[in-house]
């Protein structure tokens, strides 16, 4: 017999198997000896009033437990109809895995390098401070998500089957605990191996990868009054043909936006967010969030999620990394961009998070003549200005949080876990005035929710500008571009996702949308 129940457990009860067994048996009205197994289905940590794990468990009473099978069901697609997937980030990879399930051969075109070489290129960036524009913290196998902590949660459950995404990660090497955590993460140190395992699955079942291959154009044919995409062309002149093209190039592939602009294909400006990355001692965040509880020894490094409104703008935390580091995330020379990541153990002494301000067309009327690329142009100019302020290097401008909020230069700065040099800068003078005002007020308002957040122990680093794409490539109800049939814009780069899980689901949905066009056996999902 099995019984599912919800139970609140103290950290000590949760992490001590005998205590958990007793608590669950008591809640279920059973004797401890009758419980053969307790399977945790869901857990979330609540530290608001005392520290408790809200837990959903399945109790096996006098019945043996059979572990879940997380394996996918992939077809041999070596000789099947092909679909071109531009980009090997989460949207592209999960589109490829889903393609194998439904009987399509995925051909993945990736501008960057496999994760093994990408790791070496990033190490080279750390030594030389020179950005490789095709292989960096954003570009390469796995996309930007490979180096962003591997957070696996999304606010929306309407996009698709989140458990399916988690199962594919577990199948390829992720800790099965991601299937139960309300705020699951994998860790940058684990993700590269998982991404490589996904590549092996895709190639073993007939998929192809073309690395160091940058798409320069779409192959478009006119069929009556309709334009239909037949494939892509790369910068070397090679062509790749398929039954459809999934465009999953990520939020930093600015050359794709320029291609669309030059061709006159439909795009639109999309609101995005821009700000700074805030860094605190992790011990301070733990004390604030866990209220100096004796149970802290059982608990993971504390996280936070903050949001407020200032002058009609949203101000919010983004990509919060407990026990993390800050990385130089520029994709070309002449840019300064920061992002955060953390490894699976989240054991750095620092916590960091983007704190960003929403930006819309109404905020930048001076760029109106740029049309769909108005916000992209604004984003570029801010990144260039910060780069110049840092001495034309990828050194990160840094300032004490309290000094930033009071519009005064810092006389000295805190230590930072930025993977590169920092330079003392008055960041309040570098960013657009409306962004600075919103950040200054928002950071102080956050102290009302997390007393101690506003402190001279914290630093701000600039600039957090790649929160999402400032451009949307539109699509209709079939997920195709309105002008270009059989082109499926998806993921963050098309403006339809924001994070690993939502991007993965968008890639899956793009493949599902192909099925009315190409006769395929339906399998699952």
Residue ranges and their predicted role:
Residues 2-53, 57-147, 151, 155-525:
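Residues forming the flavin
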């Amino acid at each position: 017999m099995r019984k599912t129940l919800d139970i609140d457990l103290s950290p000590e009860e949760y992490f001590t198997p005998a205590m958990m067994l007793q608590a669950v048996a008591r809640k279920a009205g059973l004797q401890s000896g009758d419980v053969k197994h307790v399977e945790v289905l869901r857990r979330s940590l609540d530290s608001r009033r005392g520290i408790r794990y809200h837990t959903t468990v399945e109790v096996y009473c006098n019945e043996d437990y059979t572990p879940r099978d997380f394996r996918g069901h992939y077809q041999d697609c070596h000789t099947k109809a092909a679909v071109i997937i531009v980009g090997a980030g989460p949207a592209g990879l999960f589109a490829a895995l889903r393609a194998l399930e439904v009987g399509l051969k995925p051909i993945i075109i990736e501008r960057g390098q496999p994760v093994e070489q990408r790791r070496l290129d990033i190490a080279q960036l750390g030594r030389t401070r020179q950005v490789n524009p095709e292989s960096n913290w954003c570009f390469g196998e796995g996309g930007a998500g490979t180096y962003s902590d591997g957070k696996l949660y999304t606010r929306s459950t309407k996009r698709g089957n989140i458990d399916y995404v988690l199962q594919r990660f577990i199948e390829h090497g992720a800790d099965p605990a991601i299937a139960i955590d309300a705020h699951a993460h994998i860790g940058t140190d684990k993700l590269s191996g998982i991404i490589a395992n996904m590549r092996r699955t895709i190639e073993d079942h007939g998929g192809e990868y073309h690395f160091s291959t940058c798409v320069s154009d779409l192959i478009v044919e006119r069929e009556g009054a309709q334009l239909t995409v037949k494939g892509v062309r790369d910068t070397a002149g090679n062509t790749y043909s398929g039954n459809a093209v999934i465009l999953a190039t990520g939020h930093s592939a600015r050359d794709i936006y320029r291609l669309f602009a030059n061709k006159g294909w439909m795009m639109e400006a999309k609101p995005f967010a821009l700000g700074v990355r805030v860094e605190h001692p992790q011990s301070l965040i733990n004390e604030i969030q866990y209220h100096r509880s004796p149970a802290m020894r059982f608990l993971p490094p504390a996280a936070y999620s903050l949001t407020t409104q200032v002058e009609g703008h949203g101000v919010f935390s983004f990509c919060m990394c407990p026990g993390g580091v800050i990385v130089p995330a520029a994709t070309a020379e002449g840019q300064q961009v920061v992002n955060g990541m953390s490894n699976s153990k989240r054991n750095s002494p620092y916590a960091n998070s983007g704190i960003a301000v929403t930006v819309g067309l109404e905020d930048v009327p001076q760029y109106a003549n740029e049309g769909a690329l108005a916000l992209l142009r604004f984003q570029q100019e801010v990144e260039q200005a910060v780069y110049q302020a840092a001495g034309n290097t990828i050194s990160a401008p840094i300032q004490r949080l309290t000094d930033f909020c009071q519009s005064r230069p810092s006389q000295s700065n805190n230590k930072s876990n930025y993977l590169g040099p920092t330079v003392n800068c008055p960041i309040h003078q570098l960013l657009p005035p409306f962004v600075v005002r919103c950040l200054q007020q928002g950071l102080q308002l956050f102290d009302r929710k997390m007393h101690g957040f506003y402190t001279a122990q914290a630093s701000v680093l600039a600039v957090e500008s790649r929160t999402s794409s400032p451009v949307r490539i539109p699509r209709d109800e079939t997920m195709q571009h309105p002008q270009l049939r059989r082109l499926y814009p998806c993921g963050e780069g098309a403006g339809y996702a924001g994070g690993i899980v939502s991007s993965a689901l968008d890639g899956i949905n793009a493949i599902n949308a192909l099925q009315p066009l190409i006769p395929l056996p339906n399998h699952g999902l």
